[in-house]
């Protein structure tokens, strides 16, 4: 009796193994994706045609080689150069605001992969570090300082949205004029005195003053 039981058990195991051998290939075949020739595949986002007269914006702030302080959203000069090299190697073409406005008004179209480079807040590092890099690449950019920060007298701390900041970290008007005279940089305005947070609701949430007081 035990022999018969063992025989039946072994037969069941063999039946399962045989079924897996015969039926598994059919299951595997269903899981194998159908081959699609490269020319027939859908284009991914990186391969799709660049939309007409569209551009992307890359926004930078401070460029600091001593400490890349994230309170100022800082990046090191070597990292900035690496990013610029990547943009150039991948076909991105920096454009000016003047080019963008002209394209929107029926003028010359923007190039494919048009890119607007902006540097906010008006750090003096733009004069010392960024401008030489822009000259090397011959790329346009936008510098948008905060008016009252640039107005801060020498020797006084700048109230950087509640963060006490050394005056020399912010550009002077003389430096901004030299930057504008370079022919590569357009000067914008990162507000005159609205670059700080205020309580935006009864719950105490903080929001930029520019969007809560206008």
Language model feature labels by segment:
Residues 39-46, 100-104, 127-130, 163-180, ...:
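Alpha-helical scaffolding within the catalytic cores
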Residues 75-109:
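C-terminal domain-boundary segment and adjacent tail
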Residues 58-66, 70, 113-115, 135-214:
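Metal-dependent polysaccharide deacetylase catalytic core of the NodB/CE4 family, i.e.
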Residues 11-22:
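Bacterial N-terminal signal peptides
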Residues 73-88, 122-124, 166-174:
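Aromatic- and glycine-enriched glycan-recognition loops and surfaces
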């Amino acid at each position: 009796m035990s022999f018969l039981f063992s025989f039946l058990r072994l037969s069941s195991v063999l039946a399962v193994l045989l079924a897996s051998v015969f039926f598994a290939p059919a299951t595997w075949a269903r899981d194998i994706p159908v081959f699609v020739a490269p020319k027939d595949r859908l284009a991914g986002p990186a391969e799709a045609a660049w939309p007409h007269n569209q551009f992307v914006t890359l926004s930078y702030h401070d460029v600091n080689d001593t400490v890349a302080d994230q309170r100022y959203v800082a990046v090191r000069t070597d990292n900035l150069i690496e990013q610029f090299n990547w943009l150039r190697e991948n076909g991105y073409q920096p454009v000016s605001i003047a080019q963008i406005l002209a394209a929107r008004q029926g003028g010359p179209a923007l190039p494919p992969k048009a890119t607007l480079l902006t540097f906010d807040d008006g750090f003096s590092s733009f004069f010392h570090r960024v401008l030489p890099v822009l000259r090397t690449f011959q790329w346009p950019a936008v510098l948008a300082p905060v008016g009252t920060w640039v107005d801060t007298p020498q020797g006084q701390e700048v109230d950087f949205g509640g963060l006490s900041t050394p005056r020399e970290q912010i550009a002077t008007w003389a430096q901004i004029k030299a930057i504008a005279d370079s022919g590569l940089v357009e000067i914008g305005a990162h507000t005159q005195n609205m670059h700080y947070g205020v309580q935006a609701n009864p719950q105490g949430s903080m929001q930029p003053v520019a969007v809560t007081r206008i």
